[in-house]
Regions:
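N-terminal low-complexity, intrinsically disordered segments
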Residues: 55-80
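A short glycine/small-residue-enriched secondary-structure motif
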Residues: 43-56, 88-99, 253-258
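A generic alpha-helix surface/boundary motif
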Residues: 28-29, 70-71, 99-103, 160, ...
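Acidic, low-complexity proline/glycine-rich segments
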Residues: 1, 76-93, 189-208, 289, ...
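Glycine-rich cofactor/substrate-binding loops
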Residues: 1-26, 36-39, 46, 50, ...
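Alpha-helical bundle segments that constitute or directly flank the non-heme di-iron/ferroxidase center
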Residues: 18-29, 114-117, 121, 226, ...
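Charged, flexible cofactor/metal-binding loops and thiol motifs
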Residues: 101-114, 128, 142-296, 303-304, ...
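Hydrophobic alpha-helical hairpins/lids featuring a short glycine-rich hinge
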Residues: 89-134
Length: 420
C-alpha cells in the first residue's frame, strides 16, 4: 500500500515482522498444548517464546527454500535447538498461515469497527444539530419535496449502522482456525489438541476442513468491507452534489492555505469526497477477487495466496483511510443555511405539488384530472403564490393553508427515537 492511504495501526498489523511474530505465537501456543497433553516435554514453548525470528532472516532463507513458511520454521527450529522437532509437528503451512490470518483479520476488523463507531457519532451529532433544518429533497437530481437535513443525515447514520452490524458478523465468521494437517483429516494432530490450541487464541475449529480455512469466510469479510465502501461512496457522491456551484448547500472543509486548483484561484473542490469515491472502486474490485478466491482445486491450491497478499492489507488500509477521511468531512463540513433557504424558495412551486394534489382529491376532484391540471399550471407559473392562485381559480377551492409552515413538511417529532 502506498503511504498516501496507509493507516498506521493496519500497516503495523500487516507488516511482515508482525506476521512472522504471529506465526511464532501460533507455533508456541500449539507446542504449549502438546506439552499439556503429555505429547511434548515441558519447556519447549518457553524456548519458542524467548527467541525472535527477524523478517530479514526469513527473506534470506527463502532464497534457498522458495517457501516463506518453511523458511520461518527452519530458522525457528535452529534457534530453539533441543526439542525443536515439536515445532510444526503434524502441521501443514496453511495451519499456521490461515490461523494467523484469522487473528490478524480479527485485529484489523477491531480497528475498523472503532473507526466506524467514531464516524457514526459524528453523523449523529450533525444530524441532531440539523434535525429542524428544512432542505429541498431531490429525486433523480430534480426538486421533489421539502425534507429535513437531519433526516438525510439520519438516513446515512442508519445505513452505516447496518454496515457496523455486518462487520461484527463477519468478525465472528472469520474467527476460525485449523490445525488438522495437509487435508484436514487429523493424521497426526487430534481434534482435541486443535480445539484446545485454538481456544487459547480465541478462535474456533474449522470442522470438515480441507487444507485451509474456507475462503467463503474471507469473502464475507471483504464483501462487508465492500458494502461499507459503497455506502461511503453514496454519501460522498451526495456531498459532491451539494457542493456543486449551482447548489452550494454543503461544503467540505477548506483549510487555510489550501489550493483548489493550480490554475483557477476561485476553486474549492470536494477532493475528499472524490477521493472516497475513487477508493471505493478499488475496494469493490478487491471484493470480487475475494469471491474468486473461493474457487480452489480439491483440498486447495495456492492461486488464492498471491491475491490475498495484496488485497487483505490493502483493503484494510484503504477502508480505514476512507473512514477517517469521511469522519473528518462530516465533522467539519460547512452548511450554507442561507443558500439552502434560497433553494427552498426557488423550489416552492414544485415542492407543494403533492400536497395540492391531495387537497384536490380530498375535495372529490378526479385524481388524474387534478394531476394533469397541476402539472400544466406548474410550468406556467413561476411562484408558489401564482400556482396556488391559478389552481384556486380553476377548481374554485381554498388553498390558503397549503403554504403554512405546519403543513409544508412531514412530522419529525420522533427524530431521536429513530437512532435506536
Amino acid at each position: 500500500m502506498i503511504n498516501r492511504y496507509k493507516n498506521q495501526k493496519i500497516s503495523y498489523i500487516w507488516n511482515d515482522q508482525n506476521k512472522f511474530d504471529t506465526w511464532k505465537k501460533v507455533q508456541e501456543t500449539y507446542v504449549k498444548t502438546l506439552e499439556e497433553e503429555g505429547v511434548a516435554k515441558p519447556g519447549i514453548s518457553e524456548k519458542i517464546a524467548s527467541v525472535s525470528v527477524e523478517a530479514e532472516e526469513v527473506y534470506e532463507r527463502e532464497k534457498v527454500t522458495n517457501h516463506d513458511l518453511a523458511s520461518f520454521v527452519d530458522i525457528l527450529q535452529n534457534k530453539v535447538g533441543e526439542g525443536s522437532n515439536w515445532i510444526h509437528y503434524g502441521l501443514t503451512s496453511s495451519d499456521v498461515v490461515d490461523t494467523s490470518n484469522s487473528l490478524l483479520i480479527k485485529e484489523s476488523l477491531e480497528v475498523l469497527l472503532k473507526l466506524v463507531d467514531d464516524l457514526l457519532n459524528e453523523i449523529k451529532n450533525r444530524a441532531i444539530d440539523e434535525q429542524n433544518t428544512k432542505i429541498i429533497g431531490r429525486t433523480h437530481g430534480v426538486f421533489a419535496e421539502e425534507t429535513f437535513l437531519g433526516n438525510i443525515l439520519g438516513n446515512w447514520y442508519l445505513e452505516i449502522k447496518r454496515n457496523l452490524d455486518r462487520l461484527s458478523t463477519a468478525k465472528e465468521t472469520i474467527s476460525y482456525g485449523k490445525l488438522s494437517g495437509p487435508v484436514g483429516n487429523y493424521t497426526v494432530v487430534t481434534p482435541e489438541i486443535e480445539d484446545k490450541t485454538l481456544k487459547k487464541l480465541n478462535l474456533k475449529s474449522e470442522k470438515f476442513a480441507s487444507q485451509i480455512v474456507s475462503r467463503d469466510r474471507y469473502a464475507e469479510v471483504f464483501s462487508a468491507i465492500s458494502i461499507l465502501a459503497s455506502s461511503y461512496d453514496r454519501i460522498a457522491g451526495n456531498l459532491r452534489s451539494y457542493q456543486r456551484s449551482e447548489i452550494s448547500e454543503i461544503f467540505e472543509p477548506f483549510k487555510d492555505g489550501q489550493k483548489g486548483s493550480s490554475a483557477m484561484p476561485h476553486k474549492k473542490n470536494p477532493i475528499g469526497s472524490e477521493r472516497i469515491s475513487g477508493l471505493s472502486r478499488i475496494i469493490r474490485g478487491y471484493s470480487i477477487s475475494s469471491l474468486e478466491n473461493m474457487v480452489l482445486w480439491n483440498e486447495r491450491d495456492i492461486s488464492n495466496s498471491s491475491v490475498e497478499r495484496i488485497i487483505i492489507p490493502d483493503s484494510f488500509n484503504i477502508i480505514c483511510f476512507m473512514t477517517t477521511e469521511l469522519t473528518s468531512i462530516i465533522k467539519n463540513m460547512v452548511i450554507n443555511h442561507e443558500q439552502i433557504n434560497k433553494n427552498l424558495e426557488n423550489a416552492k412551486n414544485k415542492s407543494i405539488s403533492q400536497r395540492v394534489l391531495s387537497v384536490l382529491v380530498n375535495n372529490g376532484i378526479d385524481r388524474d384530472n387534478a394531476y394533469r391540471s397541476i402539472q400544466s399550471l406548474i410550468f406556467e407559473n413561476n411562484s408558489a403564490e401564482e400556482l396556488i392562485k391559478a389552481i384556486e381559480e380553476e377548481f374554485d377551492i381554498d388553498l390558503s393553508n397549503i403554504t403554512n409552515s405546519e403543513n409544508e413538511i412531514g412530522n419529525n417529532d420522533s427524530f431521536l427515537d429513530k437512532f435506536n
